[in-house]
């Protein structure tokens, strides 16, 4: 069985992500410091809340550099995905810098509410094993007011007043802006794909 580390960065979705993994028959150990990452074969960084507080917590736990230097597959979920980018407009905070791009506040418009809450369709942008087995018009559940831009690393986008990154992968670094633990079959498939796929 894969040694799976689930980082406690203070997000309220930690328990629900853990339960989603248990439904897949996978047990994760909760990690709160750099020592806990030792021996991990896969790492999940969940997160709910604000980027400045999450980065401060990771810094207090001594996890910034260990995450940046990680040599095993990592997936960030929701705020956890945003933290993988260079910077966030939320609190004007520098993030982990593991993916290029700046996370920006979503702009409300006629018929476009911010925060973006609810089910929305994924728009595939390129091939990735992260999307294996998903139906053509798969939908996922989103709750966020900030979003990462579409880049060359974007695997799937989503449209809410403009396209943003919904799923990202660059080498060992992956992310999902939506909540897999609240996205029914789509979320379960993404988590299973991350745990089982081969990485370069």
UniProtKB/Swiss-Prot annotation:
Q: Which Gene3D superfamilies match?
A: 3.40.50.880
Q: Could you tell me where this protein is found in the cell?
A: Cytoplasm
GO cellular component terms attached to this protein's record: cytoplasm
Check the record and name the InterPro entries matching this protein: Class_I_gatase-like, GATASE, Imidazole-glycPsynth_HisH
Q: Which catalytic residues are annotated?
A: 78 (nucleophile), 179, 181
Identify the metabolic or biological route this protein is part of. Amino-acid biosynthesis; L-histidine biosynthesis; L-histidine from 5-phospho-alpha-D-ribose 1-diphosphate: step 5/9
Its primary localisation, in coarse terms, equals cytoplasm
Q: What are the protein's UniProt keywords?
A: Amino-acid biosynthesis, Cytoplasm, Glutamine amidotransferase, Histidine biosynthesis, Hydrolase, Lyase
Offer one example of a GO biological process linked to this entry: L-histidine biosynthetic process
The protein's job, in short, is: IGPS catalyzes the conversion of PRFAR and glutamine to IGP, AICAR and glutamate. The HisH subunit catalyzes the hydrolysis of glutamine to glutamate and ammonia as part of the synthesis of IGP and AICAR. The resulting ammonia molecule is channeled to the active site of HisF.
Enumerate the PANTHER family for this protein: IMIDAZOLE GLYCEROL PHOSPHATE SYNTHASE SUBUNIT HISH
* Name this polypeptide is given: Imidazole glycerol phosphate synthase subunit HisH
